[in-house]
Each structure stands twice: as structure tokens, then as C-alpha cells.
Swiss-Prot record:
Region (Disordered): 360-385
Organism lineage: Eukaryota, Viridiplantae, Streptophyta, Embryophyta, Tracheophyta
Protein name: Tubby-like F-box protein 5
Family note: Belongs to the TUB family.
UniProt organism field: Arabidopsis thaliana
Gene3D superfamilies the UniProt entry points to: Tubby Protein, Chain A
Gene: TULP5
Length: 429
């Protein structure tokens, strides 16, 4: 009996338990008291069955070897869902998966929902694409499963919906493709702009590593041991990044210039041996919550206006990212950036982000729109983290854009930054 058939057997068994629990919950609407007690008994019975099943009692050494082989063999989606299915069998299997399956920073793979808020790979990039729906003002982020840019088959990751207000624009970001709202249990953050569309704040529902620097809920204690999204403190809006587009006061045509201050990432993260501190609450419950039904919670906004979070002297400086200045090609009369074939359509939205410590002011005359024609240059020697492109975004077709990111950005952060380029900018171009 192959291991994949075993996984399917276990998954079907767990699925039957879930369906039984669902049937019990549905019956609650008619006979509340009786159904409630019956539902508890059925739930306990299911837990006992799972706990006593032969799958939960496999020897640890055997289970570890099997999980390792599965993690190595099922390395891409959709086959990767077998690893997720194993983590949902029981607590023993879940803990084993948590120990074996590495974060994207070291594996380069997106496996569990928590991976969307973990830094990308250090030695590679994660290739994604964004599909825009102008009629519904929605944006969907997918993991690229094929090298072909225009192939519209991918693993869904995140979605966003734009809402225009009188003085600002807001993008709500969710892990659900259809239910995109702040009241949903899949809501994980938002992007908010000012009136001109030149400044954006990225808000996360979980505090960053330096949450003491970020405006926190007043007169409330914070506990991280509950099984809910937020035990005593409702999920809030924590300022983790600020995106600013430089004003174009002269009115000349040219590429946009963007600055990103990543409050949740220290500048030392790009130094040798540097790391991105994790969110204690979020990562502590992440894998368990991936397999539980998360109830919606009240939203508390303690984000403030477009001002920098309060910082004390001696605190770690945040990472600052800037757009890489393109080269002006006089024969083509266009701006040029090397996207290595990942961007094919010239657009003012196209950009590449790298550490501000290495960005030098570009030179050249004013000209047309930003082109994406790759420049032919000899292979460069190995780059340091400061010299590498951390995020690049560009157009490949009608309402289709590629988004590739790497360490230290996460998929959530890269998606939020990319969303800012879709907004109308009255004074930047």
C-alpha cells in the first residue's frame, strides 16, 4: 500500500468526522439543547477515534522518515496538499510536520497559511502573479506553477478589494478568494492611502516584533495563549510599513520613485547573520489555527494617521527599500530595467525594489514611459543581500502582473506594496 493511498485514506477518515460534526451543527437550529449535548458527545467520540487510530500511534522514527520523504517528493502544488493533509490528521502528525516542514526562508516553499507572513527564500525568489478584476475592484495573488508567464493556472494565495472613500482609498486583504471583508475570519490586513495616493500605510492584524514601537490598545493586557485569533485583545490594525511615492513637481514624464519603510523588519536583517524577528502570537498558534475554524472578531483600529509610529531612542532602525532607478536608452527613447523576461509590457507601474543603502540616483534625460526591455549585460558576480532585487512587479498582459519576491519580505508584505501601484497618483506622474 503506497503512502499516498494511506494519506488519502486518513484524509477521507478525517473528512468523514468533519461532515458528521457539520451535520450535528446543522441540527442545532431545531432542537438546541438536545443537539448541543449530542454535538459535544459526537465531538468527543471523534477525538477518541482519531486518538486511538493506528495512524496516530505510528512509531515516531517511522513517522519522521515518512514525513521527510513526503516533504521532499511533494515539493510543488497541487501535490503539496498531501503534506497539508498529513498535518491535519492529529496533533502528533501536526507536530511532526511543524518540525520537518521548513519556512519559506529556508525551503523556498509555501505550504501552510502561516507561510504568507514569513520571509521569502534567501537564495532564490518566489514567483507569483496578480490578476486584476476592474469591474469588482478586486485583486488576486497566485503562486506561479509554470514558468510560462501567461499561463493562468496557479495556487491561490491572497485577495484584496479596493474601496474608495472621500479622502482615502483602502485595500482589504484576505486569505479567501471570495469573502473579502474586515469582518471575515480570513482578514489579515489592509493598505490605506492618503487623498493624493502618494502615501500608503500597510496594516497587519498581528503586532510586529517591535510592537512596543507601534501604537497599542490602551488599558488592555496582551495574552498569547488562547486558541482564538486574539484572546483578550481583538484583532487590530498595526502599522508595519509605509510606502511613499515621491512627488513629481516639475510635471515631466518618467518612472515613479517609491520609498518603503518596513517597520516590522530591522535594517540588520540584510546583514550577514541577520534575521527577521517573527510575530510571537501569530507564529505560536499558526499551524494549529490552520486546521481550526476561526471565528470572526471585533476590529480595533489603533493605527493613527499617516504619521510614523512612536519610536524611542536606541531602537533598531527599520529596513528602508527604494526603487531601482532605470537606465534611459536614447535610441529607444524609453526607460529600461532588467526583469529577466518576467515582465513584457511597458508600464509606469513596473518597478524593482532593493535596499536603499545601495540605490544610487539614476541619470538620463526625461523621456517616455518606463519600458521593461531587458538589458543585455554580462553575468554579475555573486551579490550581497543589499545588492539583490527584493521585489519586482510588472505587467505581462491585460490585467495580469507578475510579482516576484525574496527575503526579507513576506508574500503579504510584497502583495500590499504591489497594490499601492494600482492606485491613482495625482502628483507623481
Amino acid at each position: 500500500m503506497s503512502f499516498l493511498s494511506i494519506v488519502r485514506d486518513v484524509r477521507d477518515t478525517v473528512g468523514s468526522f468533519s461532515r458528521r460534526s457539520f451535520d450535528v451543527r446543522v441540527s442545532n437550529g431545531t432542537t438546541h439543547q438536545r443537539s448541543k449535548s449530542h454535538g459535544v458527545e459526537a465531538h468527543i467520540e471523534d477525538l477518541i477515534v482519531i486518538k486511538n487510530t493506528r495512524w496516530a500511534n505510528l512509531p515516531a522514527a517511522l513517522l519522521r522518515d515518512v514525513m521527510k520523504k513526503l516533504d521532499e517528493s511533494e515539493s510543488t502544488w497541487p501535490a503539496r496538499k498531501q503534506v497539508v493533509a498529513c498535518a491535519g490528521v492529529c496533533k502528533t502528525w501536526r507536530l511532526m510536520c511543524k518540525d520537518i516542514v521548513k519556512s519559506p526562508e529556508f525551503s523556498g516553499k509555501l505550504t501552510f497559511p502561516v507561510s504568507l507572513k514569513q520571509p521569502g527564500p534567501r537564495d532564490g525568489i518566489i514567483q507569483c502573479y496578480i490578476k486584476r478584476d476592474k469591474s469588482n475592484m478586486t485583486y488576486h495573488l497566485y503562486l506561479s506553477l509554470s514558468p510560462a508567464i501567461l499561463v493562468e493556472s496557479g495556487k491561490f494565495l491572497l485577495s484584496a478589494k479596493r474601496s474608495r472613500r472621500a479622502t482615502y482609498t483602502e485595500y482589504v486583504i484576505s486569505m479567501d478568494a471570495d469573502n473579502i471583508s474586515r469582518s471575515s475570519s480570513t482578514y489579515i490586513g489592509k493598505l490605506k492611502s492618503n487623498f493624493l495616493g502618494t502615501k500608503f500605510i500597510v496594516y497587519d492584524t498581528a503586532p510586529a516584533y517591535n510592537s512596543s514601537q507601534i501604537l497599542s490598545p490602551p488599558n488592555r493586557s496582551r495574552s498569547f495563549n488562547s486558541k482564538k485569533v486574539s484572546p483578550k485583545v481583538p484583532s487590530g490594525s498595526y502599522n508595519i510599513a509605509q510606502v511613499t511615492y515621491e512627488l513629481n513637481l516639475l510635471g515631466t514624464r518618467g518612472p515613479r520613485r517609491m520609498n518603503c519603510i518596513m517597520h516590522s523588519i530591522p535594517s540588520l536583517a540584510l546583514e550577514p547573520g541577520g534575521t527577521v524577528p517573527s510575530q510571537p502570537e501569530f507564529l505560536q498558534r499558526s499551524l494549529d489555527e490552520s486546521f481550526r475554524s476561526i471565528g470572526s472578531s471585533k476590529i480595533v483600529n489603533h493605527s493613527g494617521d499617516f504619521t510614523r509610529p512612536k519610536e524611542e531612542e536606541g531602537k533598531v532602525r527599520p529596513l528602508v527599500l527604494k526603487t531601482k532607478p532605470p537606465r534611459w536608452l536614447q535610441p529607444l527613447r524609453c526607460w529600461c530595467l532588467n526583469f529577466k523576461g518576467r515582465v513584457t509590457v511597458a508600464s509606469v507601474k513596473n518597478f524593482q525594489l532593493m535596499s536603499a543603502a545601495t540605490v544610487q540616483p539614476g541619470s538620463g534625460s526625461d523621456g517616455g514611459a518606463l519600458a521593461t526591455r531587458p538589458s543585455l549585460s554580462p553575468q554579475q558576480p555573486e551579490q550581497s543581500n543589499h545588492d539583490k532585487i527584493i521585489l519586482h512587479f510588472g505587467k505581462v498582459g491585460k490585467d495580469m502582473f507578475t510579482m516576484d519576491y525574496r527575503y526579507p519580505l513576506s508574500a503579504f508584505q510584497a502583495f500590499a506594496i504591489s497594490l499601492s501601484t494600482f492606485d491613482t497618483k495625482l502628483a507623481c506622474e
